[in-house]
């Protein structure tokens, strides 16, 4: 029979609307307290899923070589949010190089949208602001998708020292001009940004 901790963990894996909406993770305290047999069962379950940031978070909590290899397998996922969450976790553990983080950011930044990696990409770019990443943010500020341009401009402005926060509200009017659908307006705002 499953322990109360394992039952709690399994219940937390079945997320509903509130957990999804609020980004509530699995019960990691219950996961940490499992006996070795149940930890293995939990790891098997998580490796079979790997479809949500919560799975990555729980695999990272387990921290076994097999769990971390499972996270590493997501570095080539078509799901940008999963790829970026995996990148963050593996970079924190020094399992991937700074060059690999940069490569993933350069590949994913132009394609992220809300709910599909935007927040994670910007957070990771802020934590790994190489020159190539900053240049890619500038590119996205002008040529990125409608949802990305404003945020890419704000973060680039900050990373190049032009503002005091990753989204400096005192510069919001400038950032919003980069959100225009009219390319000439974006170009004029870009020149002001730089």
Each language-model region and where it sits:
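Extended repeat-based scaffolds of very large eukaryotic assembly and lipid-transport proteins
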Residues: 1-66, 73-84, 93-99, 106-111, ...
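Hydrophobic core positions within HEAT/HEAT-like alpha-solenoid repeats
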Residues: 56, 72, 86-88, 119-122, ...
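Alpha-helix capping at helix-to-loop junctions
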Residues: 92-96, 127-130
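Extended alpha-helical scaffolding segments
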Residues: 117-194
């Amino acid at each position: 029979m499953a322990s109360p901790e394992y039952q709690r963990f399994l219940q937390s894996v079945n997320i509903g609307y509130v957990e999804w909406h609020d980004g509530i993770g699995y019960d990691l305290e219950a996961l940490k307290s499992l006996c070795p047999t149940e930890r293995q069962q939990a790891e098997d379950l998580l490796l079979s899923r790997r479809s949500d940031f919560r799975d990555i978070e729980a695999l990272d909590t387990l921290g076994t070589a097999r769990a971390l290899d499972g996270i590493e397998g997501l570095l080539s996922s078509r799901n940008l949010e999963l790829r970026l969450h995996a990148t963050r976790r593996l970079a924190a553990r020094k399992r991937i190089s700074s060059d690999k983080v940069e490569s993933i950011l350069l590949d994913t930044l132009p394609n992220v949208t809300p709910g599909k990696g935007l927040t994670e990409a910007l957070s990771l770019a802020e934590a790994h602001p190489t020159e190539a990443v900053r240049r890619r943010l500038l590119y996205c500020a002008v040529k990125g998708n409608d949802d990305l341009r404003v945020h890419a401009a704000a973060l680039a402005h900050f990373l190049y020292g032009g503002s005091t926060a990753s989204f400096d509200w005192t510069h919001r009017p400038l950032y919003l001009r980069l959100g225009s659908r009219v390319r000439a307006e974006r170009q004029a705002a870009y020149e002001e940004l730089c």
